[in-house]
């Protein structure tokens, strides 16, 4: 035994002797229940967590309620599922169409496929019209030919009254009207001759 361990053992022995001198119960450190309260608390004792009523009867409910036969009463949930609450609020506030339109925007690749989604971009939805820009005029032309199929897929997924029309645009041409080297006049005339 080292000197530190001997010092600790002596300290514990002094504590035990002092507890015995005061007629206190010396805890057995090997017992798991050594520090549990062995005497019940007085019922009306407010300092010890009682109800303070002083009537001698503890009126606090403890545990699950039981029926007259002693079995637990069934637990009845009064909470409504979160999905049902959200759906009711969405309908009552008139957000159904807006949420469906947002779904179309966020799931565009799922609706048209990854190849088309790679070359197209949903710009906005306004008045049941879906505005789409394409990388090239060729993709814009192909998308215009597929317009009916795309509208059918959207109607199947989110409903018929969400998107009624597709507005498909090609890439924007560069503007010659702005920039640090802009010269007043008609612009480049024979550049595209």
From Swiss-Prot:
Q: Which organism is it from?
A: Corynebacterium efficiens (strain DSM 44549 / YS-314 / AJ 12310 / JCM 11189 / NBRC 100395)
The UniProt annotation puts the region (Disordered) at 17-74
Q: Where is the composition biased (Gly residues)?
A: 47-56
Q: What is this protein called?
A: UPF0232 protein CE0005
Q: Which domain of life is it from?
A: Bacteria
User: What protein family does this chain belong to?
Assistant: Belongs to the UPF0232 family.
**What Pfam families is this protein classified in?**
DciA
């Amino acid at each position: 035994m080292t000197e530190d361990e001997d010092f600790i053992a002596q300290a514990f022995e002094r504590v035990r002797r002092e507890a015995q001198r005061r007629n206190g119960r010396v805890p057995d450190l090997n017992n798991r229940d050594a520090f549990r309260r062995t005497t019940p608390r007085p019922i009306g004792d407010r300092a010890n967590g009682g109800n303070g009523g002083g009537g001698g009867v503890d009126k606090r409910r403890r545990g699950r309620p039981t029926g007259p036969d002693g079995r637990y009463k069934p637990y009845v949930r009064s909470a409504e599922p979160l999905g049902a609450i959200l759906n009711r609020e969405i309908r009552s506030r008139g957000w159904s169409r807006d949420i469906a339109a947002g779904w179309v925007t966020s799931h565009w690749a799922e609706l048209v496929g990854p190849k088309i989604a790679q070359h197209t971009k949903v710009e906005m939805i306004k008045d049941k019209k879906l505005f789409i820009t394409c990388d090239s005029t060729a993709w814009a032309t192909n998308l215009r030919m597929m317009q009916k199929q795309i509208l059918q897929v959207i109607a199947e997924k989110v409903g018929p009254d969400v998107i009624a029309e597709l507005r498909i645009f090609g890439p924007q041409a560069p503007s010659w009207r702005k920039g640090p080297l802009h010269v007043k006049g008609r612009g480049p005339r024979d550049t595209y001759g």
